[in-house]
Amino acid sequence: NLEIVTTTSNKYSTSFGFTEEEVRNALQLFGLQDQADNVKKWYDGFCFGNKSDIYNPWSITKYLDTGKFDSYWVNTSSNSLIDKLIQGGTSDIKIAMEDLLEGKTIETAIDEEIIFEQLENNSAAVWSLLLACGYLKVNKASKDGAGGNYILSLTNFEVQNMFRRMIQGWFGNVSV
């Protein structure tokens, strides 16, 4: 039987991402230790189960390679589904996204067993997808079974930057 293991599951929580110690060691090795605070702002924030302060390995390795801060991970795929869900979403989704972009948190139910058909105009399904994809992180959870109520925020500056660009793109494509 298949078992659903999500970002909120403790199983395998030590198997994903780089820890803060690993990142600090890598920064020192590359002579970039003075950038630790900026690296944390840009690429830290992932949570797997009860493990927090997990760094995105793709973004860290790209940063170590280039020495430049950029949106590496979020640009590895098309975010068109996310774009469509937020742009075409309810006013509640847009207001919550505005709060997230301002650094606030949102509280919502999460369904870790969502299916694609549930995404249309269902804010809890949208937040569930964003959490599962790594765009949101859990700040606090009260979990019961497959779901629960969660307090969520954007994962890090890289994600925040991606959403800002996405929303700015909506207005850049408007002809008056």
Positions of the model-derived regions?
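Phosphate-binding site recognition
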Residues: N1-V176
